[in-house]
Amino acid sequence: MLSWALIFFIIAIIAAAFGFGGIAVAAAGIAKILFFLFLVMFVIFLIMGLLGRRGPPPV
């Protein structure tokens, strides 16, 4: 259990170093762009899926 605590402590220190530096701002900007990109893709595929359902295929 102590090893897990040490691993998470190291991860927290690395995250703090990134957070207090300027990397967090750049990462947040990239995350916003990716969020809207995948949101648009989701809406497009949702519409395509709803329009593509025309009933069961003929047998």
UniProtKB/Swiss-Prot annotation:
Compartments where found: Cell membrane
Primary location class: membrane
Pfam families assigned: DUF1328 (PF07043)
Record's bilayer topology term: Multi-pass membrane protein
Top-level taxonomic group: Bacteria
A Gene Ontology term for the protein's cellular component: plasma membrane
Annotated InterPro entries: DUF1328
Record field: transmembrane: 5-25, 30-50
Record's keyword terms, sorted: Cell membrane, Membrane, Transmembrane, Transmembrane helix
NCBIfam families linked to this entry: PRK13682.1-1 (NF010226), PRK13682.1-4 (NF010229), PRK13682.2-4 (NF010233)
Recorded family membership: Belongs to the UPF0391 family.
Protein name according to UniProt: UPF0391 membrane protein lpg2521
